[in-house]
Amino acid sequence: MDKIVTRFAPSPTGYLHIGGLRTALFNYLYARANGGKFLLRIEDTDLARNSMEATKAIIESFEWAGLDYDGEVVYQSQRFDLYKTYIQQLLESKKAYYCYMSKEELDALRKEQEKNKQTPRYDNRYRDFTGIPPQGIQPVVRIKAPLEGNIEFEDGIKGQISINAKEIDDFIIARSDGTPTYNFVVAVDDALMGITDVIRGDDHLSNTPKQIIIYNALGFALPRFFHVPMILNSQGKKLSKRDGAMGVMDYAKMGYLPEAILNFLVRLGWSYGDKEIFSLEEMLELFNPNELNSSPSAYNEDKLLWLNQHYIKYMDNTLLEQLLGHFGVTKLSESKREILYPALKDRSNTLVSFAQGFNEVMNAPCSYDEKMRIKLDANATQWLNELCKNLNMASWEDNPNIIESYLHQFALEHQIKIGKLMPTLRCALLGKSGGIGVCEALAVLGIEESMRRIYTFIGYQNNI
């Protein structure tokens, strides 16, 4: 097999969405697993709709996801002279020609064909034209498509594809202003960049026969094609922003980890037995584009959250703390971090929810859960006062297990049911039910902050 060269070629008319990142991932995995090259090309020929911000977001998304590409980014907008050279080559070899039909003539032809219940298409009137060109018309350039036979190719996912040549007219490869069209620049660039395998969404399937015509006209070897089915929502419809079709960096801002996103995406259309968790190294070892499913995949947000929680749970706490800094989480001493982080990991499926849980512990409550508060024992403040007296004298240790033993001993000595003492402390320290354990909270907050919160709660209770 030749050295594998793949590419990802987004248009910078919008942000890179989740489906685009999946396509990039499939190309990346196939190239890297086979010791090949993975290239990035920005298809920015639509000068009116291009956005530098979108281009930056695409590259930022790659950096965030950890998908490195080889060489420099190729920008199609910087290659117009190159494309014109190949258009001229086709004109000189009589494989393309100037078409002088006006917009009015094209509209009239289309209306006539629709009236006769024919498929609208160009009628090849200038295909073999040798006369004098009409005045005042800036011509387009059309390629000579086959008039008979079939255009065939083997798709790695969909199998053998055959299109009747009569379904494709002499399509435009250069507009009247001289700018090349999408299918032309894609075919030329894929050939010149040495792309051996084109893995892309099946919304590009209809472009493939036209690109093959261009390949053949220029004498370029065809790459292998893999057209990946789309990602659909749970109702089987095209993914919308409401379903999850957001920019990749939106997921970063929502607190998703790149490892979770890549794991989620690789399973949308590919599987390896019943295995669900894949590190990037495992993906590189196991992924094969020939095993991609031919049916669309469904976006499942619950599955993504489950994966994200898995990667948060098993992430090194030091690295996790660095990432959480982007979400307003302050650093803790190592001893306190090693108590609080494991307690929050089991309750957090995004970095945002982790940060929220962190702040709920580290920031004193502004209010108290009323339903929880009114259920407390009538002697609650008395217990808390007595506990603070004992805490003040106790040798405090930042160890939840030692604190738990101490609280049990305190409850036993004061004839308090531990099942009543713990909710009282939780309400005073955190202001609500749920969250991390009381002993973990006491250990992380330390004796001074814990006592301050307890006395604040006692004052609140006494003033009601």
From Swiss-Prot:
It comes from the Bacteria. The keyword Cytoplasm applies. A motif ('HIGH' region) lies at residues 10-20. It is found in: Cytoplasm. It catalyses: tRNA(Glu) + L-glutamate + ATP = L-glutamyl-tRNA(Glu) + AMP + diphosphate. The keyword Nucleotide-binding applies. A motif ('KMSKS' region) lies at residues 238-242. Signal peptide: none annotated. InterPro entries: aa-tRNA-synth_I_cd-bd, aa-tRNA-synth_I_codon-bd_sub2, aa-tRNA-synth_I_CS, aa_tRNA-synth_I_cd-bd_sf, Glu-tRNA-ligase_bac/mito, Glu/Gln-tRNA-synth, Glu/Gln-tRNA-synth_Ib_cat-dom, GluQ/Sye. Its EC number is 6.1.1.17. Keywords: Aminoacyl-tRNA synthetase, ATP-binding, Cytoplasm, Ligase, Nucleotide-binding, Protein biosynthesis. GO terms for molecular function: ATP binding; glutamate-tRNA ligase activity; tRNA binding; zinc ion binding. ATP binds at K241. Its main location: cytoplasm. One of its GO terms (biological process) is glutamyl-tRNA aminoacylation. PROSITE patterns: AA_TRNA_LIGASE_I. One of its GO terms (cellular component) is cytosol. Catalyzes the attachment of glutamate to tRNA(Glu) in a two-step reaction: glutamate is first activated by ATP to form Glu-AMP and then transferred to the acceptor end of tRNA(Glu). PANTHER family: GLUTAMATE--TRNA LIGASE, GLUTAMATE--TRNA LIGASE, MITOCHONDRIAL-RELATED. Monomer. Belongs to the class-I aminoacyl-tRNA synthetase family. Glutamate--tRNA ligase type 1 subfamily. This is Glutamate--tRNA ligase 1.
